């Protein structure tokens, strides 16, 4: 255990203590350091399993923080949509433009407290790089990153490491990779390398989506 390990006795409400005890009973440790401000982007990595969601949700309930999270809009269809939104979900269209990024950044800053959780891999399956949306959103809104990891090898859910982006993508991604070094998802071979996709050549035709 380290100085950031959270214990049930330190939590103020019964529901928070219960959520943390459930995590502890499952063998998990929760690390937490107070957030650096009222707005920011929580980057969650690695994301290789559906089990990440209930583990993360218990951590969210234990901390008593109303983290919002982003997921593709198709997951919000039907009766589950209302439940997903109640749990903090924000539906997004994956075809969204930079204009939509600016709009989301302003929406986040217009409220008193808003931290948005994003899985930069965008999928539980392997992909060769991270999606860059989290980076553009953080730099547009000028907010810090919270680097959350779900490490199945050590059974640690960590909500403790933060980073203020410099705007130098290479430098920033190296700093992010240093925090996540050695952290292992449930299916390690499905975790994406910690790097952003190279910029698209504007001369190439844009692929049409089905």
Describe the residue ranges of each PLM region:
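Helix-to-loop junction immediately C-terminal to a conserved catalytic motif
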Residues: 11-47
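Surface-exposed charge patches
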Residues: 21, 58, 82, 106, ...
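Short acidic/polar alpha-helix capping motifs at helix-coil junctions
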Residues: 4-6, 18-24, 43-49, 69-70, ...
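Catalytic core of membrane glycerolipid acyltransferases/transacylases, capturing the structured
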Residues: 33-96, 152
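Non-catalytic C-terminal accessory region of glycerolipid acyltransferases
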Residues: 1-10, 14, 18, 97-210
